[in-house]
Swiss-Prot record:
One of its GO terms (biological process) is phytochromobilin biosynthetic process. The gene is pcyA. Keywords: Oxidoreductase. PANTHER family: PHYTOCHROMOBILIN:FERREDOXIN OXIDOREDUCTASE, CHLOROPLASTIC. NCBIfam families: PRK02816.1 (NF002760). It comes from Synechococcus sp. (strain ATCC 27144 / PCC 6301 / SAUG 1402/1) (Anacystis nidulans). HAMAP family: Ferredoxin_bilin_red. This is Phycocyanobilin:ferredoxin oxidoreductase.
Amino acid sequence: MSSSTRVGLKEQLHPLIRDLATGIEATWQRWLNLEPYAAMPADLGYIEGKLEGERLQIENRCYQSREFRKLHLELARVGNNLDILHCVLFPRTTFDLPMFGADLVGGRGQISAAIVDLSPTTIARELSNDYIAGLTALPNPTFQGLRELPTWGDIFSSFCLFIRPGSPEEEAAFLDRALGFLQVHCQQAAAATALTDPEAIATVLEQQRYYCEQQRRNDKTRRVLEKAFGDDWADRYMTTMLFDLPSD
């Protein structure tokens, strides 16, 4: 699929999704030395299918850097009824860093779910003092439509924000907070020193595996993929693109 078509997909999405996608990639470019993701499955960069008669489009943009084995931004659209942004940064297991994750789900001009977090997949199983200081310093507006985390949400931090934005002002405030989280994360990652202790690296690996296993329990995502592409394809997509386990 040509790059012009992929750009066209982003331009069709809800304005908040467009703005967050643009801001995410700009932040990556500012703070990190990006390279193409070496393990990108050749057939999963751009995907089309049908979901209940509606055209389903999925675009995946993936990179890697010194600090992150994968930086993943997924954009998706189902007909005119559903727009999706999904973003996760997977640290290399030689870096004791949390997992940045952000998701937006919208349809018919309304964002129904917006979540952002830095999940403490770290040796101490909590965010470091530097992260806490950086996040605490960000503007922290009040949101009205707070949503309940899923039952498998023990992977999230106390800073996790999960809302249904009720106004353009809340959408703008969420955008600022999500990009603030990402900037703190990229700044901390760029300054981080690689681990050398094998036990510490093994602990980070274990924590990332648990994060991925919990995220794979998201039945809503799996059901959409199964309806559009079948069970086997959905399982492959969940385990190789969305939440692949680290091997390094």
